[in-house]
Amino acid sequence: MYIVIVTMRTILFFGIFFIFIFQCAKCIELKIFEDLLEVRSQSGLFFPLCSKSFHQKYGEQACASISSTFLSYSTVSLQQYTYSVGCTTSVCFTFLSSFCKTGVKVFCSPSLCASGTLQIGSKCLSISTVPVQGYSEANYYCNPATLISSLKPTEIESIRDTILPTFADTRLFLTSGLRQGATWKWGNGDTVEQEVTGTGRCLALQAGNLVAIDCDSEAYVFCESGRECIARDKEYSGTANRTSDGKMCLMWNDPTVLFRRERDLEILNHNFCRFVNDADGKKSATPVCYTKPNELSQCYIPPCPESFNDVVPIESGDSCPIGSISCDNGSKCISEKFQCDYEVDCNDGSDEHNCEDYLQYYELIGAYRLADNIIEVWTFIPHVQGCARKCRESLLMCEAFSYEPKSQTCLLTDTSQTFSSLARKITSLYYRRRFSTKDVEFQVENKVLYATKSAKKGHVCDDNYSREKLSSICRVLGFGDPIYTVESHQSESSLGPLQPTTLHPTNPSFDSPSSVSQMRRTSPSATLAPRLPAWNLSCLREPNCTSTVISTCEPIRCSHCQQAACGDGSCIRFDQLCNGQIDCQSGEDEDYCRANSFRLTNGSDTSGYLEVLFRSRWEPICADHLNGKISNSICDAMRLGEHGFILSTNATISSGYNVNCDVDCSIRRSSSCTRHARISCISQNGMSSASQCGLRYVEVNARDAAKSRIARVVGGFETVPGAFPWTAALRNKATKAHHCGASILDKTHLITAAHCFEEDERVSSYEVVVGDWDNNQTDGNEQIFYLQRIHFYPLYKDIFSHDIAILEIPYPGIEFNEYAQPICLPSKDFVYTPGRQCVVSGWGSMGLRYAERLQAALIPIINRFDCVNSSQIYSSMSRSAFCAGYLEGGIDSCQGDSGGPFACRREDGAFVLAGVISWGDGCAQKKQPGIYTMVAPYLSWISAIINGQPV
C-alpha cells in the first residue's frame, strides 16, 4: 500500500496508494521494508535508497504511507547496490549508485491507523466509494470494521473541514446511530449528545450536521476501523492477524478452537489479535490469538502515543448527572447501568474494575439453548457475565440460563430440571446455578436436610418454598422426593387462613412460595420448633457467607424415594397419592388433593379432553363421574364460560382422576376409569365462549399479496363498518388526532403497545374510541372512554422487548354490539407457524397521511431466521416477538398502527389476538417486514391484570 502525494498535498483514495513527489510529472515511489527505506527503480523493483540522496521529506512521506509519523533516521552499511534520486526542473528519476553502499533506516511512530484509513481524532476512518442501500447494507459494507460511532463535536468539525469539502452538501453519510424510543444511541451504546434534525430512525452526517433519515435511504458510509496500536487501557480492536513470530492467527470461532479451548472466551467471527482474560480474570499482557486449537500466542502491537488516547477531562467543577458515574480519568460520564456490565465504556476501563465474578455462582452444563420454561428474555447482553448477573438479580428465582454470544441473547428459567426444555445448539452456553463453594456438604439425617459449610453444620431452612421448588432442591442434591407431613399440611378446616387468599386456578405460572396451590399452611396452635443453627439456601450459595442463623425455621425434608414419600420417609408409588386409600402411616398421601389447574387438549380453545395438573404432572380426568355441576366449575375456573357441556368420547384410559367441586375442586385417583372426559365450555347466553370473542357480524375477506398495492395499513384495503370490531383507536384527547391502535379484551380492558406512551404516560392525555370506522366523521357507532390506568409489562424498557401494555377504562365500560366486540386470547401453546396468514388492521400511516377509514391487510408470519437475515436491524428483535409481512415489500403495518391487532382466524371462525403491532423499519419496504409482540407468552400477566391480581 502506498500514499499519493500531489504538489505536497495529500489526497486520500481508499484502495491503492502511491507516493508522488513535487508534481505528478516528476514522481518517485518509496516504501519501508524492515525499517530500510527503499525506492522503486525504472524496472519496477524496489532497492535501498542511497544515504546521499536522503532528505527528511522522504522519511516523512514513507512513514505516512504506513499511517505513521516520521521520528528519526540513521545510516547503515549495506552489501548490495543502492539507488539514488535525481531531479530536474520538471521530473525526478532514480538511477543505480554502484559505489554507494550505505542506506537509510527510517524510524516511524506506531501505526495509528491501518493503510487505507484516515485518522480523525481517535478514529480511523474510511469512506465507501459507492452509495449503499440502507442500514443493513452499510453494516455489511464496513465489515469487519463498523459504522462510525460516538462522534465528538471536534471530530465532526475535522470531518467537515478535511473530508466533506470534496463532496456535495446534500450527500448523506450513514453512521451507526439509531433512534431507540425518544433517545438516539450510537452503535456502541453511547447516547448521542448532539442535536439531531429530521425524521427517521437512522442517523447520518450531512454537511457537518447530524440528521435523521429513513433506514432504507441510499447513502454513503463512514466506516470506523480499530486503531493499530494499544490504548493505555489495554484496548485493541485493530486488524493485526499475525503473531510476533509471524504465524497466522486462527479464527476465534474455528470449531477446533471452540471445542478445545479452556478459557471462557468470546466467540468472534474473525482472526484478529485481541486481549483476553486469564483464569483469574486478569487481562493478558499483550493481544493474543490462537495459532493452534489449544495454543494462544502473543502478537506485537505498539502502544498508542498519549495524544492518541484522546482523553478529554470533565471540566473542573462539572459533575455527572444523577444516574451516571464518571470514569476514573474524568474522560466522560456513563450510565450507572453500564458499570460492571462486562463491556468497556470508559477509555481507561474503570467502569469494569473490581467487578464481581457472577459466573462463580453457576456451572457450565453444555452447549444447549433454553426452548421452554423461559421466565425472562434479555437482549443486547454483550458478555456471558452480564447474563449471569441478570439471573442472579432476577426477582423470579432464576435457577439457570442460556446465553448466545453471537445474538447477545440471554434466556432465564426458574427451574434447574430443564433438560426437557433444552435444545442442542453449539453457539449457545447453558449454565445452572450451583451451591457456591465445593466445601458445602449435604446429607439427610432423620429425613432432615443438613448442610455443612466452613465446619458449621445446620439444617437447611424451608423458606416457604413451593412443592416444585422443594422437589428441585432435593433431587438436584441427589436425594429423593421431598417429605411432607400432615402436621405441616393439615386439612384446611383445622388451620388458620391461607395467605394470600386469591390466586386464579388456571395460572400455575403465578404460583409462588405462598400461592394457594403450593401453600405451606401453619396451625395457630402449632408448637414452635426449638431454636437450632440453620442455613438459609441463599447463604449457602454465597461464597462470602459463612454464618448460620439461630432460627425457628422449618427444615427441608428429603427422602430417598424416586416417586413419592410418606412423612416417615417410607416410599410409595405416584399412583398411590390421592387414591382414596391411606398408604402412609399418618395419611399424608391423601392430604393436599386439590386440583389447581385444568386444561383442554386435542380440541379447540373451548372444547377438548380434560386434564388436571397434579404434582407438576398433567393427568387425565375420568368421564365416569363427571356431571354438569363439576364441568361448570371447571369451565368457570378456566375462564372459558359458566357452563360445561359434556361431550361424548371414545377415548379410553385405564386410570385417571375423578374431580369433586363442592367448594374447591379436589381430586381422587381412580384405577377403574373407562373413558377420558371431553367437554365444551358454554356461556350464560347459550353460546360457546368462542362465540363471545373474536366474532364479527360483517364478513369481509382480507386481500392477499396478489392484489394491487394500496397505501397502508400499507398495501391493504379499506374495510366496512364492523369488519374488525375488536380494533380500537387511541387518540390525543386535546387534538383528537389518531395516536395508536388497540384491541378490545373485555368491557374495561384493551391491549396495545407500551411504546405508544414513551413521550407521555399521563392517562389524561388520551381517550379510547371503539366501534369507529371513519375517524373524520361521526358514524353513530362510536363509544368514547377516558383512560383510567395504563399497565406496563414490568420488564418493559424500550420498543425492542416486552412492547405490550393494557389499558383500563372505567366500569361499566364497553357496550358490546356488532361494531364493538372483544377479541379472543390465544392458547398458551399457540404456535407462530411461518406462513400462517393473519389480519392487521388500523388507521395508521398510508405513506403520506393517516387513513381516514379503517384499513386491513392479510399478511403471513415470517420464519425468524429469514427475518433476522433480511436486515441487520432485526437482530434487535427479542424472543417474545415475531416477524410478519412480505420480504419483497408492499404490504405491512405502519406508523400509527402500533398497538393494533395481529388477528389469526381459528378453525371455528373466531379470531384470536396472536400479536400486537410493535415496530419496523420503514413501511412496506423490501426486506423490512413488521415486528409484532407475541401475546401467548404474556397470558399469565394479562390474566393477572384483568383479574386485579398483583404482578
UniProtKB/Swiss-Prot annotation:
It is found in: Secreted. GO terms for cellular component: extracellular space; membrane. Residues 713-947 form the Peptidase S1 domain. Its main location: secreted. Its EC number is 3.4.21.-. GO terms for molecular function: serine-type endopeptidase activity. Residues 490-523 are annotated as: Disordered. Glycans are attached at N241, N329, N464, N536, N544, N602, N650, N776, N869. It is an enzyme of class 3 (hydrolase). Residues 234-304 form the Kringle domain. Residues 1-27 form the signal peptide. CDD domains: KR, LDLa, PAN_AP_HGF, Tryp_SPc. Residues 355-435 form the PAN domain. GO terms for biological process: axon regeneration; larval development; positive regulation of gonad development; positive regulation of MAPK cascade; positive regulation of nematode pharyngeal pumping; protein destabilization; proteolysis. PANTHER family: FI16631P1-RELATED, SERINE PROTEASE-RELATED. The Kringle domain is dispensable for larval growth and axon regeneration after injury. The PAN domain is required to maintain gonad structure and thus fertility. Dispensable for larval growth. Serine protease which ensures proper pharyngeal pumping during larval growth by regulating the levels of extracellular matrix component fbl-1. Independently of its enzymatic activity and probably by acting as a ligand for tyrosine-protein kinase receptor svh-2, involved in axon regeneration after injury by promoting the generation of productive and stable growth cones. May play a role in gonad development. Belongs to the peptidase S1 family. This is Serine protease svh-1.
